[in-house]
UniProtKB/Swiss-Prot annotation:
Span list, region Interaction with KCNIP1, KCNIP2, and other family members: 2-20
Topological domain ranges for the Cytoplasmic compartment: 1-183, 253-263, 309-323, 416-647
Signal sequence, start to end: none
Intramembrane portions: 360-371, 372-379
Intracellular or extracellular location(s): Cell membrane
SMART domains recorded: BTB (SM00225)
Cellular compartments per GO CC: dendritic spine; neuronal cell body; plasma membrane; postsynaptic membrane; voltage-gated potassium channel complex
GO molecular function: A-type (transient outward) potassium channel activity; metal ion binding
Protein name (Swiss-Prot/TrEMBL): A-type voltage-gated potassium channel KCND1
Tissue specificity as recorded in UniProt: Widely expressed. Highly expressed in brain, in particular in cerebellum and thalamus; detected at lower levels in the other parts of the brain.
Lineage start: Eukaryota, Metazoa, Chordata, Craniata, Vertebrata
Residue intervals passing through the bilayer: 184-205, 231-252, 264-284, 288-308, 324-345, 387-415
Keyword annotations of the record: Cell membrane, Glycoprotein, Ion channel, Ion transport, Membrane, Metal-binding, Phosphoprotein, Potassium, Potassium channel, Potassium transport, Transmembrane, Transmembrane helix, Transport, Voltage-gated channel, Zinc
Length: 647
């Protein structure tokens, strides 16, 4: 026992001595003391998803929204949380930035939405980490290019319809840039395409050797020299068409300076200029070489097909977007050509009858070898020349193959962007067509029901209900809206303009009104306004309550969509559905088939000097009203016509 105690006692003493420095230090504070330092937990509620973090974590970046006192504007005292109506998935990356100091860009999120979230929280895009910075910039550049191309396509392509008062230049430019807008533009589009093809084919055919007849010499001559008159007439017709097109485009261009600097304008000038120079320059031996050189430029007419081919335009956009990669390829090839041409010249310099007479002469061999063509007109004969020729061939394959995937990816990207843009435009056209069709269909059905007596009154007194027969929910709601409009405006629905006509509607009196006000009522003997207040007949502008436009009393107003007409009572009219003589009107029906819509008429302010009492909708002297529609027979027109608007 004593031996065992003597064994472990030195170790115990050593351990006690080791603990002495720690025992002299004060004990750590209790857990409750830590909360008094001011480091508290903040709860951030982002669209219902709660995030918790330390206050000191957010205070690291005081120039941002969460790190500054501006976040107190979003504090909810009832729940004790900071509420932000933003994207919670995006906020996760924002909060990680406060924790780690590195901002990461999510791949699955839209880059534009990510930028909007950064702008809201006061973070700059330069804070994106190095791991995501390159991809972030590429995606942002691609998105900017796509938006710019879509905007340009909308401006030059199937944009919105031109207003009714558009100028001749605007209509011409729209016809040139979008031939499918009208039949005449489409015909001109195909005519110019036909003459472009004729010009290119004639330029090729005139160089084919043609044999003469048996009686004449059998010496072959080009077809252009044997039949000069025919080719001159074809060339003249084509150039006249191209000249007329160019002048019309120049006249209709929104910016003529920009049009003159465009690539297609230069192509048009190069295509037609040789013809006019050939007419002015005399044909003699001194200028024959220059004349032949000018005729070569006629081949550039083939680039006019780029206006008629979407694939050629995509190829042009691809080459434009790959300018940096193509520049790198050209620079690399130039360096390799100079190096290998120099090596091949000195390797073949000592041989007899060598074709490598100089370094520029060796350029041809190097270019043909690096592009893997290998014509065989120049070949090395020494062992060193063959070795360096093999290295030149392999290096050419590597240098040329490197930029190809980048060009292919850009072409695929631009092609799919154009496909998506075309699809969006087609979907927009279909959507607008469906809206017009549904609107026109329900309107015509409403008029037909009125003509056939399909709409009847049921009930009496304040229990007015509109009975319908075999109609869809959309039709029922639309008909109910028109019915309520009739009751509140004291006029029957007669006709509805089309969608495009309604957008371009112009008031006959030069005035517009944004609400169905009392100024839209007819003024005359026996009308509602004249019977209640004769001063309304004066043409004096007033400001109505709940109205943003100043209207004129006693003037005929054209507001938006509908037209009303007062005339005598007819057997099939629904005069009982309009305003009643008493003041209590049931504006909505109690049927379950409809969505109630309350439509109120703004009334003049009570402090108007010349109006003591508002007019009653059921004033005396109001004649019965009937239906007027062009499809229902010849209507009887009366001079008191007023147009009312749909809501």
């Amino acid at each position: 026992m004593a031996a065992g105690l003597a064994t472990w006692l030195p170790f115990a003493r050593a351990a006690a001595v080791g603990w002495l420095p720690l025992a002299q230090q004060p004990l750590p504070p209790a857990p409750g003391v830590k909360a008094s330092r001011g480091d508290e937990v903040l709860v951030v509620n982002v669209s219902g998803r709660r995030f918790e973090t330390w206050k000191n974590t957010l205070d690291r970046y005081p120039d941002t929204l969460l790190g500054s006192s501006e976040k107190e504007f979003f504090y909810d005292a009832d729940s004790g949380e900071y509420f932000f109506d933003r994207d919670p998935d995006m906020f996760r990356h924002v909060l990680n930035f406060y924790r780690t100091g590195r901002l990461h860009c999510p791949r699955q999120e839209c880059i534009q939405a990510f930028d909007e979230e950064l702008a809201f929280y006061g973070l700059v895009p330069e804070l994106v980490g190095d791991c995501c910075l390159e991809e972030y910039r590429d995606r942002k550049k691609e998105n900017a290019e796509r938006l710019a191309e879509d905007e340009e396509a909308e401006q030059a392509g199937d944009g919105p319809a031109l207003p009714a008062g558009s100028s001749l230049r605007q209509r011409l430019w729209r016809a040139f840039e979008n031939p499918h807008t009208s039949t005449a533009a489409l015909v001109f589009y195909y005519v110019t395409g036909f003459f472009i093809a004729v010009s290119v084919i004639a330029n090729v055919v005139e160089t084919i050797p043609c044999r003469g007849s048996a009686r004449r010499s059998s010496r072959e001559q080009p077809c252009g020299e044997r039949f000069p008159q025919a080719f001159f007439c074809m060339d003249t017709a084509c150039v006249l068409i191209f000249t007329g097109e160019y002048l019309l485009r120049l006249f209709a261009a929104p910016s003529r300076c920009r049009f003159l600097r465009s690539v297609m304008s230069l192509i048009d000038v190069v295509a037609i200029l040789p013809y006019y120079i050939g007419l002015l320059v005399p044909k003699n031996d001194d200028v024959s070489g220059a004349f032949v050189t000018l005729r070569v430029f006629r081949v550039f007419r083939i680039f006019k097909f780029s206006r008629h081919s979407q694939g050629l335009r995509i190829l042009g956009y691809t080459l434009k977007s790959c300018a940096s990669e193509l520049g790198f390829l050209l620079f690399s090839l130039t360096m390799a050509i100079i190096i290998f041409a120099t090596v091949m010249f000195y390797a073949e310099k000592g041989t007899n009858k060598t074709n490598f007479t100089s370094i520029p002469a060796a350029f041809w061999y190097t270019i043909v070898t690096m592009t893997t063509l290998g014509y065989g007109d120049m070949v090395p004969s020494t062992i060193a020349g063959k070795i360096f020729g093999s290295i030149c061939s392999l290096s050419g394959v590597l240098v040329i193959a490197l930029p190809v995937p980048v060009i292919v990816s850009n072409f695929s990207r631009i092609y799919h962007q154009n496909q998506r843009a075309d699809k969006r435009r087609a979907q927009q056209k279909v959507r607008l067509a469906r809206i017009r069709l549904a609107k026109s269909g329900t309107t015509n059905a409403f008029l037909q029901y009125k003509q056939n007596g399909g709409l009847e009154d049921s009930g009496s007194g304040e229990e007015q209900a509109l009975c319908v027969r075999n109609r869809s929910a959309f039709e029922q709601q639309h008909h109910h809206l028109l019915h309520c409009l009739e009751k509140t405006t004291c006029h029957e629905f007669t006709d509805e303009l089309t969608f495009s006509e309604a957008l371009g509607a112009v008031s006959p009196g030069g005035r517009t009104s944004r609400s169905t006000s009392v100024s839209s009522q007819p003024v005359g003997p026996g009308s509602l306004l004249s019977s209640c207040c004769p001063r309304r007949a004066k043409r004096r502008a007033i400001r109505l309550a709940n109205s943003t436009a100043s209207v004129s009393r006693g003037s005929m107003q054209e507001l938006d969509m509908l037209a009303g007409l007062r005339r005598s009572h007819a057997p099939q009219s629904r005069s009982s559905l309009n305003a009643k003589p008493h003041d209590s009107l049931d504006l909505n029906c109690d049927s379950r088939d409809f969505v109630a819509a309350i439509i109120s008429i703004p009334t003049p302010p009570a402090n108007t000097p010349d109006e003591s009492q508002p007019s009653s909708p059921g004033g005396g002297g109001r004649a019965g009203s009937t239906l007027r529609n062009s499809s229902l027979g010849t209507p009887c027109l009366f001079p008191e016509t007023v147009k009312i608007s749909s809501l």
